[in-house]
Amino acid sequence: MAGAQDGSFHGDEDCQMPITLDRVREIFKGLEGGDGSAFFDHVADDVDWTVMGTHPLAGHYQNKTAFIAGTFAKLGQVLPNGAQLRAEHLIVKDDQAVVELHSFATAKNGMRFDNRYCWVVYFRNGLIVRVRAYLDSAMVTRLFQENPIPGTESRN
């Protein structure tokens, strides 16, 4: 997987087909139900996923398992019904997409967790291989301060 100067990936170019707007929309539909498994079927096991910011979910995750454990699993402990994420705006070019998402959720303490996200997504052979995710860091911090995960209070 070689990174070009523009930040895109151009490995296996002979197999690479541009991703379409309809395909990206279909993939992201898998996040609307709150569990995400349909979405994660389209994420490479060795995905390189960076959640920007200085909050309890921020970090550089070097595979799908680590990303899910560090983000979705933690959110599942404080959002009883999970976070329903809806893709609202998409820009797709070649093997890249920029996806604006809006989450709808209620925390254990009743706090509304309606966050906004921007994910810069890179595809290879139809799978998501790299993501840079941006979100409201202050809202995430507040969520975990008001709804601590047992045993992690001192780390949030």
Model-inferred region functions:
Residues 44-94:
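A solvent-exposed, acidic/Ser-Thr-rich amphipathic alpha-helical stretch
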Residues 9-16, 73-156:
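A beta-strand edge to alpha-helix "cap/lid" segment located at domain peripheries
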Residues 2-42, 147-156:
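Short, low-complexity N-terminal intrinsically disordered segments enriched in polar/charged residues
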